[in-house]
Amino acid sequence: MSRSIRNQDVPELPRRRQVRTVGMSGNYWYVVEIDGRLKPRQVKRVRFWGQDIALFRDAAGELHAVEDRCPHRQLPLSQGFVEGGNLVCTYHGWKFDGCGRCTEIHHELGKGRTRLPRIRIRTYPVKAQWGLIWLFPGDPALADGTPLPTIPQLEGGRPWPFFPIDVTIKAHFSMIVENVCDFNHEYLHRHKRPFLQPILREWKQDADSVRVYYDTRFDGSPVAKLFMEGGARDLNEIEIWYQYPYQGSDIGGKYIHWLFMLPEDERTTRCFFVFLFGPIHVPIVNWKMPEFLRKPILWFTNKWYIEPLLGEDKWALELEQDGFERHPDAPQIELNPAISSFQRLSLEKWKAYQQSMERAGPKPAADPA
């Protein structure tokens, strides 16, 4: 479906309250951590829509993800430690391997037993790609057949360098989708000026994505003036997508961003931003930046400009979440007709996921091995 914004009525959004409570489908790969932050023999707790998961690397550096709950006394396994290939509960010393099996019990009632308790905690498919750790929280049988997003700039012999930005926002993921896809909040960034005078040209929706197209200017930001080719004066449009459950944008094939959201609960979303810069130029002379300077410049740009810019969105979104909780039944006047498409897609995907779980039936937290 493709629609122009011409002659469109301002839509009513009766689904607003509903979309602020749904989760995301577990049958996709989600970024749960930056790869370099989890060293061998380390364990961390991550969360997907109320599911606490212990993410750890064994002594050999292999990734594992298990339910963050020792079946003995229900303590979080993420409070324990890694020993060899096992995750050890810090309370009684019960050990679990990466397949979720109990491999050893430390105390005298467990030592020397020829048969350990036949229990197995839930495990999750997990892998590292592009410097990010991805986890599949849904039906594990679907993991191998579910692809990661296609990012050609990160493939091949010379992938574009980047430094991922990790931001936790105390807001529902649907608010974040609307924020990053709706350029009508230009006023919030009136001092940093990342885009100017945006005009929504059209939007398209299919079963898995919504794409919006804006005419806008990018030559107002200091990053554009300093490092973008020609000060970005020849760039005047952007394509933005909500390719469920991922979000991203493309400015002329030269400057691209991806947002990988990890919905922790109804009011908390961990966001992993990836900003990909193609041509970067030396200020004033407008020469192509030498390769050895690209990474330092990208790191500097993140710290000096992009992270403070995202901080403005975080501030506004957390206030929006607070306002929604205080006034959940207040009518919302929405002028951007594409917003209803984002909300509809989130609702449809969540409904389909719930139906798939109902067909599969309930699964016990700890199954017989």
Swiss-Prot record:
The keyword Oxidoreductase applies. It comes from the Bacteria. InterPro entries: Cholesterol_7-desaturase (IPR050584), Rieske_2Fe-2S (IPR017941), Rieske_2Fe-2S_sf (IPR036922), VanA_C_cat (IPR044043). It catalyses: a 3beta-hydroxy-4,4-dimethylsteroid + 3 NADH + 3 O2 + 2 H(+) = a 3beta-hydroxy-4alpha-methylsteroid-4beta-carboxylate + 3 NAD(+) + 4 H2O; 4,4-dimethyl-5alpha-cholesta-8,24-dien-3beta-ol + 3 NADH + 3 O2 + 2 H(+) = 4beta-carboxy-4alpha-methyl-5alpha-cholesta-8,24-dien-3beta-ol + 3 NAD(+) + 4 H2O; a 3beta-hydroxy-4,4-dimethylsteroid + NADH + O2 + H(+) = a 3beta-hydroxy-4beta-hydroxymethyl-4alpha-methylsteroid + NAD(+) + H2O; a 3beta-hydroxy-4beta-hydroxymethyl-4alpha-methylsteroid + NADH + O2 + H(+) = a 3beta-hydroxy-4beta-formyl-4alpha-methylsteroid + NAD(+) + 2 H2O. It holds the Pfam family VanA_C. Pathway: Steroid biosynthesis; sterol biosynthesis. Its cofactor is [2Fe-2S] cluster. PANTHER family: 3-CHLOROBENZOATE-3,4-DIOXYGENASE (PTHR21266:SF57), IRON-SULFUR DOMAIN CONTAINING PROTEIN (PTHR21266). Participates in the biosynthesis of bacterial sterols. SdmA oxidizes the sterol 4beta-methyl group into first a hydroxyl, then an aldehyde and finally a carboxylic acid group. This is 4beta-methylsterol monooxygenase.
